[in-house]
């Protein structure tokens, strides 16, 4: 999305980059929650 009216760029607040370990942990937790909530146990027509 391109800002049309404001020509002045807003500086993003500089944050520390998260490490790969955090990405892996987040991905694993998401997979675990999927399994817990039973998305994989639904009938096949609901599967992506």
Curated annotation (Swiss-Prot):
Residues of the region (Disordered) are 1-48
> Where mainly located?
nucleus
InterPro entries xref list: Spermatozal_protamine_typ
State the UniProt keywords alphabetically. Answer: Chromosome, Developmental protein, Differentiation, DNA condensation, DNA-binding, Nucleosome core, Nucleus, Spermatogenesis
Subcellular locations according to the entry: Nucleus; Chromosome
**Which GO molecular function entries does the Swiss-Prot or TrEMBL record give?**
DNA binding
Highest taxon listed in the record's lineage: Eukaryota
Regions of compositional bias (Basic residues) in chain numbering: 1-29
* Any one cellular-component term (Gene Ontology): nucleosome
Q: Which organs or tissues contain this protein?
A: Testis.
Q: Which Pfam families match?
A: Protamine_3
Q: Name one GO biological process term.
A: nucleosome assembly
Q: According to its UniProt entry, what is the function of this protein?
A: Protamines substitute for histones in the chromatin of sperm during the haploid phase of spermatogenesis. They compact sperm DNA into a highly condensed, stable and inactive complex.
User: Miscellaneous notes for this chain?
Assistant: Two isoforms exist, a major form and a minor form. This is the major form.
Q: What is the protein's given name?
A: Sperm protamine R3 isoform 1
């Amino acid at each position: 999305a391109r800002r049309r009216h404001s020509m002045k760029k807003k500086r993003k607040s500089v944050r520390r980059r998260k490490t790969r370990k955090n990405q892996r942990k987040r991905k694993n937790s998401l997979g675990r929650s999927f399994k817990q909530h039973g998305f994989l146990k639904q009938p096949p027509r609901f599967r992506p």
